[in-house]
Swiss-Prot record:
Complexes and interactors: Part of the 30S ribosomal subunit.
PANTHER family found in the cross-reference section: 40S RIBOSOMAL PROTEIN S11 FAMILY MEMBER, SMALL RIBOSOMAL SUBUNIT PROTEIN US17M
Keywords, alphabetical: Ribonucleoprotein, Ribosomal protein, RNA-binding, rRNA-binding
Phylogenetic classification of the source organism: Bacteria, Pseudomonadati, Pseudomonadota, Betaproteobacteria, Burkholderiales
Biological process according to GO: translation
UniProt protein name: Small ribosomal subunit protein uS17
GO terms for MF: rRNA binding; structural constituent of ribosome
One GO CC term on file: cytosolic small ribosomal subunit
Function: One of the primary rRNA binding proteins, it binds specifically to the 5'-end of 16S ribosomal RNA.
UniProt record similarity statement: Belongs to the universal ribosomal protein uS17 family.
NCBIfam families per record: PRK05610.1, uS17_bact
Length: 92
């Protein structure tokens, strides 16, 4: 890998979250949860946001913990791609 290619890929943001929906074709919805400190009260609050991410092979299922990486816009709402599976969902 060239030096320019290493720099270009490292600039992309990566997030780790849980797949909450896999009903769309080649798209999963990933929930990202962050703990932030409230500016006035100091209590830690859980903030969350959902991202649509590209899943080319439809291989990620609901409950999987995945890493997503920012990419060029693929559609109106999809600018992320699933880069790897962190942890598979537990089957009960």
């Amino acid at each position: 890998m060239t030096e320019a290619a290493k720099t270009e890929t490292s600039l992309r943001r990566t997030l780790v979250g849980r797949v909450v929906s896999d009903k769309m074709d080649k798209t999963v919805t990933v929930l990202i949860e962050n703990r932030v400190k409230h500016p006035l009260y100091g209590k830690y609050v859980l903030r969350s946001k959902k991202y649509h991410a590209h899943d080319e092979a439809n291989q990620y299922k609901e409950g999987d913990k995945v890493e997503i990486q920012e990419t060029r816009p693929l559609s109106r709402t999809k600018s992320w791609v699933v880069s790897r599976l962190v942890e598979a969902a537990r089957v009960i």
